[in-house]
Amino acid sequence: MIVNQWVPAAHRGDAIGDSARQMRDMLREAGHESDLYALTIDDELRADVRPFSDPDARRGDVTIVSA
């Protein structure tokens, strides 16, 4: 199952972004394909979080939207 998460911003130390990254890691450990997408991404997180403009942001079986 593909489970993607959308958050408005991914900043290190931000509760929503940090929680979303932890959830993504847990989903991956459980055998699911999972990625995190954001509108605004800190430079240091660009290798870990994908932009909303990525075509893969629209694929998946489940999308979790956090605000």
Language-model regions: role of each:
Residues 43-67:
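Extended catalytic core of nucleotide-activated donor transferases of GT-like folds
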Residues 18, 24-25, 49-50:
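Charge-rich, low-complexity amphipathic helices
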Residues 22-32:
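A short, Lys/Arg-enriched amphipathic alpha-helix followed by its capping loop at the start of a domain
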Residues 33-43:
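A short beta-strand-loop structural module common to alpha/beta enzyme folds
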Residues 1-3:
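Extreme N-terminal starter segment of soluble prokaryotic enzymes
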Residues 7-19:
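A short, glycine/small-residue-rich beta-strand->loop->alpha-helix junction that serves as a flexible
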